[in-house]
């Protein structure tokens, strides 16, 4: 009996100890919009390594849908159960920051710990909270939009890379007929698609054309905006006919019909093996070693500025998060841990850290079809990345109106009316945009 009692006593003490251990363990809840099974597994593997090195911290990876992030955060906030970390697109940062649910001091601490100089300038500028001047979230990865162009045919025609407006116009004049090309490019002109908005926005910013000025006035009919509309729509004379969007643009370039393509870094594998067609099957690329003959021009230089367009993903540390969350975020941006996440989609997960570029270049066999210079240019594309939606001094109302501009496809409609229908000019198109955006701003105020 004594031995039995002693055994029970020992077991009881062990259980008490284990209970105390469990209570003392810090739990960090990490929501990720990388929610596919294989991606969640990669996050969990990094978290497992972290927990092995930090046994007093438990990291719970919770997959969430991108479209439902705002609603789930709202529900969690109402229940006073916000997660500690959220992986989210840059478009969420301004709203969550304005709501006061992002721990900006924690984000600043992580960025400073990693080293501010290791981050690309563009992503850092995009996460600044204009109200506080602090970084509202930690940049993580993203994709870059660029002009992909036939470098071999540019050389044959004596053209310089399509960076400046003058360079692009010169290419539009000379490329048709060069090396069997039928057109210089495919222009986004479909009024029912967002592709024209994405391409035009880079053109506009490269001429310092923005929807609002510093005082919050609508500026859709400025000389800069009119000039951007004229430059963009004039390119249609050398472009594939008819309403076009990303699919037609991609196929025309892969088939050797057009010499320039506005597209994101997601095109990289398609230029090797052909993209999927709407009716099934893949494009059969007739151009030998198309990636090796393709150049990459992410930066556009206009008369009054320069710009790169793309998307940025961030890690937000939520208000009230345990300080351990900072340690977790930094871990996910460190060494092999960061590379393992980037490897999930190397074309769409371009590193924001300069120190991670060399490792990223090794993450896909498709990268072997591109020059090291092209891969460096892709990573460098972050330096001048800007978006209308994420201009640091725009407030929540202005950003909401920009979302309305995109949602109602105002820019694609105007481009179609100017370039295809001939029912508008750049001047009348800009005037119409001014009226529409002023009305939308009034609705939001």
PLM ranges: what are they?
Residues 132-140, 145, 169-217, 224, ...:
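Extracytoplasmic/periplasmic solute-binding protein
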Residues 24-35, 57-62, 85, 136, ...:
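Short, well-ordered beta-strand elements
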Residues 27-45, 64, 398-403:
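Extracytoplasmic "Venus flytrap"
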Residues 45-120, 126, 152-163, 259-260, ...:
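Extracytoplasmic "Venus flytrap"/periplasmic binding protein-like
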Residues 271-273, 279-280, 285-288, 302-410:
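C-terminal lobe and pocket-closing loops
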Residues 90-144, 169, 196-199, 286-300, ...:
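Hinge/lid segment of periplasmic solute-binding proteins
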Residues 172-174, 214-243, 285, 289-295, ...:
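Glycine-centered hinge/linker elements that transmit conformational signals in sensory
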Residues 1-29, 52, 427, 431, ...:
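Short, low-complexity disordered leader/linker segments with a strong preference
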């Amino acid at each position: 009996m004594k031995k039995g009692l002693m055994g029970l006593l020992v077991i009881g003490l062990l259980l008490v100890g284990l209970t105390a251990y469990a209570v003392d363990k810090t739990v960090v809840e990490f929501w990720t919009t990388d929610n596919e099974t294989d991606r969640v597994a990669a996050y969990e593997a990094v978290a497992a390594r972290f927990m092995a090195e930090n046994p007093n911290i438990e990291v719970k990876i919770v997959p969430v849908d991108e479209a439902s992030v705002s609603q789930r955060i709202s529900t969690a906030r109402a229940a006073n159960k916000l997660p500690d970390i959220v992986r989210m697109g840059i478009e969420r940062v301004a709203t969550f920051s304005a709501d006061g649910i992002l721990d900006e001091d924690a984000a600043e601490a992580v960025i400073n710990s990693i080293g501010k100089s290791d981050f690309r300038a563009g992503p850092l500028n995009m996460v600044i909270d204009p109200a506080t001047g602090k970084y509202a979230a930690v940049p993580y990865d993203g994709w870059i939009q660029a002009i992909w162009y036939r470098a071999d045919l540019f050389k044959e025609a004596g053209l310089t890379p399509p960076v400046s407006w003058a360079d692009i116009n010169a290419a539009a004049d000379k490329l048709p007929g060069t090396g069997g090309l039928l057109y210089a490019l495919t222009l986004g002109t479909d009024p029912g698609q967002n592709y024209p908005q994405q391409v035009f926005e880079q053109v506009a910013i490269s001429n310092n054309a923005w929807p609002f000025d510093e005082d919050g006035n609508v500026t859709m009919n400025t000389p800069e905006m009119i000039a951007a509309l004229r430059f963009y729509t004039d390119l249609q004379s050398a472009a594939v006919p008819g309403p076009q969007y990303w699919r037609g643009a991609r196929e025309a370039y892969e088939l050797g019909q057009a010499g320039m393509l506005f597209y994101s870094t997601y095109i990289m594998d398609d230029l090797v093996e052909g993209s999927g067609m709407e009716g099934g099957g893949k494009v059969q690329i007739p151009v030998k070693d198309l990636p090796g003959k393709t150049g990459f021009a992410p930066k556009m230089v206009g008369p009054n500025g320069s710009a790169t367009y793309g998307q940025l993903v961030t890690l937000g540390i939520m208000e009230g998060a345990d300080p351990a969350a900072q340690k977790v975020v930094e871990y996910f941006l460190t060494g092999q841990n960061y590379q393992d996440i980037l490897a999930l989609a190397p074309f769409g997960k371009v590193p924001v850290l300069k120190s991670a570029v060399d490792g990223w270049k090794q993450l896909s066999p498709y990268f072997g079809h591109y020059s090291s210079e092209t891969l460096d240019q892709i990573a460098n594309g972050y330096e001048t990345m800007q978006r209308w939606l994420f201009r640091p001094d725009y407030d929540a109302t202005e950003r909401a109106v920009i979302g309305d501009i995109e949602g109602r496809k105002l820019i694609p409609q105007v481009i179609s009316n100017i370039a295809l229908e001939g029912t508008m000019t750049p001047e009348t198109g800009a005037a119409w945009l001014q009226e529409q955006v002023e009305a939308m701003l009034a609705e939001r105020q």
